């Protein structure tokens, strides 16, 4: 899982992820932004579910993050729409609406994000 952190002209951090993990980047860009307390909550949840049968989920404005002891799933909340709610002929490109990755890989990105943000 490759990633890149950039700063826009306003100094805001933008995350770009490799193909198949784009939604992870969107989650950082839309849900985390500068809200490092959300990352605290996610890391605490990861410690809680790691090595257990439990899972944890947090619905955000645009994306929901779900994790169990081994993997993390981030999905666009728009995926909750049933087929009848979408306009005829419309469908969502799931690869850009859903990403799965390993817990350890995800936590490495979280740590790298924190480090990048702290170098303001």
Swiss-Prot record:
Entry's Pfam families?
A: UPF0231
InterPro entries found in the cross-reference section: UPF0231 (IPR008249)
Q: Which family does it belong to?
A: Belongs to the UPF0231 family.
This protein's name: UPF0231 protein YacL
Q: Which organism is it from?
A: Salmonella schwarzengrund (strain CVM19633)
Source organism lineage?
Bacteria, Pseudomonadati, Pseudomonadota, Gammaproteobacteria, Enterobacterales
């Amino acid at each position: 899982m490759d990633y890149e952190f950039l700063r826009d002209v306003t100094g805001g951090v933008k995350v770009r992820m490799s193909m198949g993990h784009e939604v992870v980047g969107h989650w950082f860009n839309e849900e985390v932004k500068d809200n490092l307390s959300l990352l605290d909550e996610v890391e605490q949840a990861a410690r809680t579910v790691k090595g257990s049968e439990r899972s944890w989920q947090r619905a955000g404005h645009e994306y929901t993050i779900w994790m169990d002891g081994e993997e993390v799933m981030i999905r666009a909340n728009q995926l909750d729409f049933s087929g009848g709610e979408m306009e005829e002929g419309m469908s969502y490109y799931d690869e850009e609406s859903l990403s799965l990755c390993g817990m350890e890989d995800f936590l490495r990105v979280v740590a790298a994000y924190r480090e990048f943000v702290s170098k303001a």
